[in-house]
């Protein structure tokens, strides 16, 4: 049975209802509040401990600034439930009034008042109530808390909104440029200077803004403001007029190349481009009316990198048409041709892509570019079913550039094209020689596995075992790869051993996989085979793996940053719900992008306490990938729950009951589709937690009376309801094996039905490996792994039903 839902307020605000005492900065060992685990036992040990770094002495208790055992976001206070409810309803003004009322009745301690004032100021500002926001920010800025700089910038924003730009500079002057908060002050200073007509100061401030922003809508908006200010300055002859106009022209064009820019911003950028051209003298107008070849290449590349392939192809076509014939073979012209072919292939215009690559190969001589073009031409031909042409291109790459990093890729894909043509002997010959011909090639494990898989499919188990033994003896084959590959060769080697009569050796390998790779796809595959052979033995191995997990806390290494003011600011920002700026503070400390598990676990818990499932899950997922051999037992149970969170429980459990879909599968789909980001958007125009496209959502929403527009699909209550409905519809399409709803969710129901017709009654593990779409194949493995993890963590009594995969597809 599914567990009952947690209270809605706890879901929303990250209430501290878990057992983790986490990373303490006030002591080296933190005790854990005991609570009942799902199995009804009391936690044996504190799951988180902070240990001194190996190269430093322990941090004395009296010198530590903060302790996460004392950290509690303001809105988890039960007395502020009305504030949280108003925020959830999207009414920050009501939330501000609720908070003011509560403060009048329950004054906080003097040392804590700044937190409530800062939250109050943020609520007023979000509601557009700038006068009371200014008052509340001023109370914070007059103190000495870690939030003083943020309050001063808040004052500056409020003053600007109230039409008092002259006072903005005074409020912002005390904010150090070395603090992360500085990125917030520059837009305010720029706008204040622009409003006052000080265009030079505005331009300088906007340039500061751009230094802190990467590509995206926010940067595009700042570039647009800078372009406008430059053109305004040029209009009145302030500064170097031609230089200002040309810079504005460049910015306007760059905006049009950036991904995910709102349509209104794009239209404004086009208008600024036209205005800039109009301001140029006639000779310069003619010179700059069209982008020069280098600018055209950058535009095509930007669109291609953003995977906006239709636009990239259109831009490439226009660029090539404008290029003189003599420049087609230049480095710029050749690169545009390559990107054009790549865009055509991405939009499935394979024949045209092949023609473009053929043209490039006839004109361009750069060895690296030719190798890329030959490889891409081969892949386009193979995708178009032109396997002889694909073989020709792959062979040409190997012959012309045998040392190129794509040469072993070409060998693999060429062999697969031979297999598609039924030329088994050549397929075998090419892949058998791959390890010797390309001993350092990164495709050696994959090519060898594909050879072994073919032999397994033909029931040549001895041949498969020999190939896999060679792979497992190759150090490269055990190098770090994505988690869904972990254990693949070991599992199928055991399968081959079992089929050749070495049953006990095979069963021993299955046991090792169960111990070594908890809840991974190939652990589930191994458990399923072992369970079919001896269910009690499988259960005993699982029990021993759990018993082997070390007791005691998950250790977080102490760092000097934990006692610094930057970390203190991050904690305070998380406490008042400003997750974005809190994360920036951690990033400035070099913590947010850490690859060290002991740091990531601490960050994950901090994010969870602050109420961000998205950030918490991301950090924990990275941490768990670095320690994949630790089963979720004792302290590690809560660690795994951070990597596999269960938010929106009331909605999920309601929809699971309504549709007959288990919550473990719903959460697994959600985790793999959006990583728990309600605002997620894909390049295929899929939206929200379960990544629905509008036409699919509309067909499910109509009978339920629910909206299905883009904005509504970003609301968890709508998205989960419709996504679960789609999952149920797909499961009903495969009554003999509802798990085929998983590949159907990714690739559409028609493809799994076709694959079933092509391979009826196939072994389930081989059927999954032979899914022709790489994305779908890997997706199925990840979802099955996540589904089992959710069952283990939240439905333990029912876990075995999720751990045992079907032996056949039907």
Model-predicted segments: where are they?
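N-terminal secretory signal peptides that target proteins for export/translocation
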Residues: 1-16
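Acidic, polar-rich low-complexity tracts and alpha-helical solenoid repeat scaffolds
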Residues: 4, 17, 28, 32-684, ...
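Leucine-biased recognition of intrinsically disordered, low-complexity hydrophobic segments
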Residues: 12, 23-29
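Catalytic and substrate-binding regions of cell-wall glycan-acting enzymes that process beta-1,4-linked
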Residues: 507-514, 689, 736, 741-796
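Acidic/histidine metal-binding catalytic segments
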Residues: 662-668, 734-742
